[in-house]
UniProtKB/Swiss-Prot annotation:
The record marks 126, 164 as: Essential for catalytic activity. Pathway: Cofactor biosynthesis; riboflavin biosynthesis; 2-hydroxy-3-oxobutyl phosphate from D-ribulose 5-phosphate: step 1/1. D-ribulose 5-phosphate binds at residues 27-28, 32, 140-144, 164. HAMAP family: RibB (MF_00180). Disulfide bonds: none annotated. Mg(2+) 1 binds at residue 28. Its EC number is 4.1.99.12. This is 3,4-dihydroxy-2-butanone 4-phosphate synthase. It comes from Agrobacterium fabrum (strain C58 / ATCC 33970).
């Protein structure tokens, strides 16, 4: 299986499908499943829980987290890659303990719903929002930023639900295993490196258009 084009991943996400995004070998060298938060389903959450096995998180813009009064988990981040975890949350209306796939999907969709208010969420909970760098992957080449950028490019709310992919033995899946996993489940694989190149191309194109205008 070959690495897919960024354009194909954008189209897949716009249709509500999941994709796998891989970062650089000299970074985490891991793959995350990404799906648009505004159309996430219980079935997609269950797939992440059963097959990917990582932590289900929601990559979000900082302004949305501020609007919901969801602060960073710690004031001083000492994690190696500075992943910006916030306080975990559960959506209260219409959910039970918050941990089921259905409850988690409700929480994710509520996080990106304009009608949600800070008091609608219990803290701590079972969904972990992540605060994305405001410059996206051009500011930080993480899965958090890739999820936000891809969903924005797909015309969705700029928030992606993400989950790391692990092997059956609990080790983290790398590119060879990720390609096998993707082929088995019919998912596209793209790289953050290609997403950075795609976005840099967009920036250059915008600059050229402004100069022509």
């Amino acid at each position: 299986m070959t690495i897919a084009k960024i354009e194909d991943a954008i189209e897949a996400i716009s249709r509500g499908e999941m994709v796998i995004v891989v970062d650089d070998e000299d970074r985490e060298n891991e793959g995350d499943i990404i799906a648009a938060s505004d159309s996430i389903t219980p079935q997609q959450i269950a797939f992440m829980m059963n097959h990917a096995r990582g932590l289900v998180c929601v990559a979000m813009p900082g302004e949305r987290l501020d609007a919901l009064d969801i602060p960073l988990m710690v004031s001083r981040n000492t994690e190696s890659l500075k992943t910006a975890f916030t306080v975990s949350v559960d959506y209260i209306p219409g959910t039970t303990t918050g941990i089921s796939a259905a409850d988690r999907a409700k929480t994710v969709r509520a996080l990106v719903s304009e009608g949600s208010r800070p008091e609608d969420f219990a803290r701590p909970g079972h969904i972990f929002p992540l605060r994305a760098n405001p410059e996206g992957v051009l500011g930080r080449t993480g899965h958090t930023e890739a999820a936000v950028d891809l969903c924005r490019l797909a015309g969705k709310f700029p928030s992606g639900t993400i989950c790391e992919v692990a092997n059956d033995d609990g080790t983290m899946a790398r590119l060879p295993q990720l390609e096998i996993f993707a082929e088995r489940h019919g998912l596209l694989v793209v790289t953050i490196k290609d997403l950075v190149s795609y976005l840099k191309g967009e920036v250059v194109e915008e600059m050229v258009q402004k100069q022509v205008a």
